[in-house]
Amino acid sequence: MKIPRILLAAGASGSGKTLITCGLLQALVNRKLKTASFKCGPDYIDPMFHSRVIGTKSRNLDTFFTDGDRTRYLLAKNAGDCEIAVMEGVMGYYDGVGGTTSRASAYDLASVTDTPVILIVNSRGMSVSLAAYVKGFLEYKNDSHIQGVIFNQMSPMLYPRMKKLLEEELSVKVLGYVPKVEDCVIESRHLGLVLPEEIPELKNRLGKLSEILEKTLDIDGILKLAGKAPELSIPVFSDLIRKDSAFGYRSAEKVRIGVADDEAFCFFYADNLSLLEQMGAELVHFSPIHDTELPGDLDGLLLCGGYPELNGKTLEENQEMCSSIRKAVEGGMPCLAECGGFMYLHQEMEDMEGNFRKVCGVIPGRSFRTPKLTRFGYITLTEKKDSGLGEIPAHEFHYFDSTDCGTDFHASKPASTRGWDCMHYEGRLMAGFPHLYYYGNPKVPVHFLKNALEYKKERRQKKDAEI
């Protein structure tokens, strides 16, 4: 399959990847090009910027969660009908799992998808040294995939000389520069980037940025480079089923799954939801903040992560919803809760002001704030009681902890001997801090939907018995 594509990477975090990616995406959309965007790694927030503010179809591609075939399948699934796919890297280009490998790095994704890479270089304080810097990235790996360079924070006066220098000395195309643009800065917060709805006039800022990039980037050259990306051998879904039969599961009946979706609960992978639908789920979105009870006739409940700690007061005030969720879960409704959703299930949850808010009361004890990131990064979950789920790749990123994290799974860090017990896995409840990506282990959604169907049948039998 021919998918025009590029990957924007950098030597380090804070080099301008997100800003330039957003500006480029907006410029492509302005040109009326059907554009797909992808974030390398597990981050939720950048794809929300891409999709909600710019309007591109945006997904994650993560080679820790998925092998090469699944990664290429997801790329084709989400970009096969687009004119260009733009991938945004993560951290430094070669930085991967454990801090000592390139596994799950932007380089790893470029290798798995055979994608041309444009290296974004923060050029502040450098001139000729830029050539040495870029040369190091080009030569660190024989197959670096780096075919273009963009200079960030460069003056218009210096750019022509630096472009000439690099193109003469290195086998790489310089595709433009970005001057310092103070009024287009994206503000930061404790989880990385703020939500798009919280940045005043963000669309205005990106509109201005895209106008600047139209003048300072060689967008035609970027499109030409993307068009040179090699054809990919893309597996079809039946190939995934042959490798893991769980992908072939289809619920015998449609099951209604409630999905928490508002300003407090907004961290979910779109590919997770589409896989649930493919397996026979009808997704019913609701708001734990604004609705007073769960939607009717649900067979299962998804409580994803987000920012419940920023909405503690309103969540506590909505005791009708807390009671509705507690009664449903205690009554046997299957519930899958991750990170912020897990925090919300506690008896008490600390908010950002240090107040402990009374919430759902399903999990005993309280979730509380910690002074730094707690158990950050990729993990592999192993179930202790072995119900057939196997190993589950997962990810944690949170500034909160719990008096009762659960002990039904063991989490182990890749490239490390460190590990800990975590997760509640009792009856039809699966809850804890780890974030799950269903394409990494499709047995997780299958198990959830089987429980939902069982719960649906139980309710139907009970209803029939009452007639």
Model-derived segments and their meaning:
Residues 2-19, 25-113, 121-148, 153-161:
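ATP-dependent carboxylate-amine ligase catalytic core
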Residues 308-383:
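Cysteine-nucleophile active-site neighborhood
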Residues 255-319, 323-328:
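Phosphate-binding active sites in nucleotide-utilizing proteins
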Residues 127-247:
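Internal gly/pro-rich beta-alpha loop/helix module
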Residues 110, 215, 253, 265-277, ...:
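C-terminal and late-domain segments of enzyme folds
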Residues 39, 174-182, 282-290:
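Beta-strand->loop->alpha-helix junctions that form or flank phosphate-binding loops
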Residues 5, 33-36, 254-256, 282, ...:
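Residues that mark the start of a beta-strand
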